[in-house]
């Protein structure tokens, strides 16, 4: 029997090269850390695709399409084309790499420039928190930046699985709540949110899972 999911969200993962975006996605979708010398942790060339179902409430599942983007400048033109069709994103930096943190605002501004006229919800992720002794960015500083930029902040480690599941759950639930409030709408021609496979009997919160030709969110 086909798995029931009420929505499909397309999420993009952005940030500098080597901050661990691919390792985070492997941990979340496959439940394992591929290892520092695994090809899975090599810098992404262009864009890679991952997928997983996430249950946000009992009996309510969201299908996540996850796009892992290259951090290198030569692939940025490819990355930019994926912003517009994403409803959410993880903006990842390495807590042991000060420069990756300093580039957070650049990534955010680039995303905002290319997402118009749609809305994208971001979560700021401080990765590699298992390397706390090598930290170059304090939690307090990262939290200040996230507040200034209107994002939530979480620290994760793909190596020991710290907060990996939680980070994807937080962003997925935030988007789901905005849909229920009518602040994010399903629209024809936009891939960010799609209605899913639901039973004939739907709950009131799911009755709005219908595409709209116009949205004034």
Swiss-Prot record:
Regulation: Regulated by guanine nucleotide exchange factors (GEFs) including c9Orf72, which promote the exchange of bound GDP for free GTP. Regulated by GTPase activating proteins (GAPs) which increase the GTP hydrolysis activity. Inhibited by GDP dissociation inhibitors (GDIs).
Topology class, membrane: Lipid-anchor
Lipidated sites in chain (S-geranylgeranyl cysteine): 215, 217
GO MF assignments: G protein activity; GTP binding
Modified residues (Cysteine methyl ester): 217
Region annotated Switch-II, chain positions: 71-87
Localization per Swiss-Prot or TrEMBL: Cell membrane; Cytoplasmic vesicle, Phagosome membrane; Late endosome membrane; Lysosome membrane
Listed cofactors: Mg(2+)
Keyword terms, alphabetized: Autophagy, Cell membrane, Cytoplasmic vesicle, Endosome, GTP-binding, Hydrolase, Lipoprotein, Lysosome, Magnesium, Membrane, Metal-binding, Methylation, Nucleotide-binding, Prenylation, Protein transport, Transport
GO BP: autophagosome-lysosome fusion; phagosome acidification; phagosome-lysosome fusion; protein transport; Rab protein signal transduction
GO cellular component terms listed in the entry, alphabetical order: autolysosome membrane; late endosome membrane; lysosomal membrane; phagocytic vesicle; phagocytic vesicle membrane; plasma membrane
UniProt-annotated binding residues for GTP: 17, 20-23, 44, 71, 127-128, 130, 158-159
UniProt-annotated stretches for the region Switch-I: 39-47
EC number(s) stated in the UniProt entry for this protein: 3.6.5.2
Post-translational modification, as annotated: Prenylated. Prenylation is required for association with cellular membranes.
Domain of life: Eukaryota
Xref: Gene3D superfamilies: P-loop containing nucleotide triphosphate hydrolases
Catalytic activity, as annotated: GTP + H2O = GDP + phosphate + H(+)
SMART domains: RAB, RAN, RAS, RHO
Pfam families found in the cross-reference section: Ras (PF00071)
Binding site for Mg(2+): 22, 44, 68
NCBIfam families on file: small_GTP (TIGR00231)
Family: Belongs to the small GTPase superfamily. Rab family.
Domain remarks in the Swiss-Prot or TrEMBL record: Switch I, switch II and the interswitch regions are characteristic of Rab GTPases and mediate the interactions with Rab downstream effectors. The switch regions undergo conformational changes upon nucleotide binding which drive interaction with specific sets of effector proteins, with most effectors only binding to GTP-bound Rab.
Quaternary organization: Interacts (GDP-bound) with C9orf72; C9orf72 acts as a GEF for RAB39A. Interacts (GTP-bound) with HOPS complex components VPS39 and VPS41, and STX17; interaction between HOPS components and RAB39A contributes to obtaining a functional HOPS complex that promotes membrane fusion driven by STX17-SNAP29-VAMP8. Interacts with BECN1. Probably associates with the PI3K (PI3KC3/PI3K-III/class III phosphatidylinositol 3-kinase) complex. Interacts with UACA. Interacts with isoform a of RASSF1. Does not interact with isoform c of RASSF1.
Protein name from the UniProt record: Ras-related protein Rab-39A
Organism: Mus musculus (Mouse)
Gene designation per UniProt: Rab39a
């Amino acid at each position: 029997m086909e798995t029931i999911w009420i929505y499909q969200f397309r999420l993009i993962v952005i940030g500098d090269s080597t901050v661990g975006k691919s390792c985070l996605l492997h941990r979340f979708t496959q439940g394992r850390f591929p290892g520092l010398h695994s090809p899975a942790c090599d810098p992404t060339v262009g864009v890679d695709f991952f997928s997983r179902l996430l249950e946000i409430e009992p009996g309510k599942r969201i299908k996540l399409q996850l796009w892992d983007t290259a951090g290198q400048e030569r692939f940025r033109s490819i990355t930019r084309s994926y912003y517009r069709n994403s409803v959410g994103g993880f903006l990842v930096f390495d807590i042991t790499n000060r420069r990756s943190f300093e580039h957070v605002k650049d990534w955010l501004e680039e995303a905002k420039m290319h997402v118009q006229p749609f809305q994208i919800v971001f979560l700021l992720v401080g990765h590699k928190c298992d390397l706390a002794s090598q930290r170059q960015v304090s939690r307090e500083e990262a939290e200040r930046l996230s507040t200034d930029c209107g994002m939530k902040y979480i620290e994760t480690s793909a190596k020991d699985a710290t907060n990996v599941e939680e980070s994807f759950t937080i962003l997925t639930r935030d988007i789901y709540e905005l849909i229920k409030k009518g602040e994010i709408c399903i629209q024809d021609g936009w891939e960010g949110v799609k209605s899913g496979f639901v039973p004939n009997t739907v709950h009131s919160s799911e009755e709005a899972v219908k595409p709209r030709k116009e949205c004034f969110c």
